[in-house]
Regions:
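Terminal catalytic/cofactor-binding subdomain
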Residues: 1-136, 142
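Short hydrophobic/aromatic beta-strand micro-patches
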Residues: 22, 149-151
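Short aromatic/hydrophobic contact patches that present stacked aromatics
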Residues: 65, 147-149
């Protein structure tokens, strides 16, 4: 039997934040997250451990993820911790004339010519996804998210969790929509990221299921 602790409903939260790496002058995406990690650790890795906050790679080489090192009960304390790490990353990237860019999707990135799949650890998994789905689309390579991972210990707790958040889920995109432009053009959607995400796994829709909203 696993010794891994099983958390109860709302006992803790896991937080993940994704950022693009871009040129400071042109805002063009830069697939140099591996160089960022190498500059910090001395080696190309898939994770950088920094106490309460860790950095990790994503599917594409221009996106870096900041995440809680372990589930936390103290969400407010991570506001300053994440901000501190963003400043550290920007200081390191400045040596390459690069910086982090927030928002949900890059407004003028061309994913069909600028996508670079992560070529290092776990590349065989990413390459398989790329072979199946062609990950050059906006729904794969131009997609930055914030994840709040909420635990549940059993089916009853999952039912309560779903009941508690089902009214909030459709509201979140309306409050946080920040991707009205793709390919340098207004799309007609305030949350173009969500619209792209809706279609990115259409070849195997069972992998995603229904999207809310």
């Amino acid at each position: 039997m696993s010794d891994k602790k099983q958390y109860k409903l709302f006992e803790v939260t896991g937080i993940e934040l994704e950022y693009m790496v871009v040129d400071r002058d042109t805002l063009k995406v830069l697939p140099i997250v591996d160089k960022l990690f190498e500059d910090v650790t001395g080696a190309i890795t898939s994770d950088v451990e920094r106490g309460d906050v860790e950095w990790s790679n994503e599917l594409v080489s221009h996106v870096v993820e900041l995440k809680t090192a372990k589930p936390t009960k103290k969400i407010p304390t991570f506001r300053k911790k994440f901000h501190s790490d963003v400043k550290v990353i920007n200081a390191v990237l400045a040596k390459r004339n690069a910086m982090l860019l927030p928002t949900a999707a890059h407004p003028f990135m061309d994913p069909f010519t600028e996508t670079v799949i992560w070529p290092h650890e776990y590349n065989e998994v990413y390459a398989l996804y790329n072979r199946i789905f062609d990950c050059r689309g906006h729904g794969w390579s131009n997609l930055q998210s914030t994840h709040l991972n909420l635990p549940f210990a059993n089916d009853d707790e999952f039912s309560k969790l779903h009941a508690a958040i089902r009214l909030l889920l459709p509201i979140i995109p309306a409050l946080s929509a920040s991707s009205p432009i793709l390919d340098g053009t207004a799309t007609g959607f305030l949350d173009s990221r969500m619209e792209a995400y809706l279609h990115h796994q259409e070849k195997l829709p069972e992998l995603m299921g229904s999207l809310i909203p």
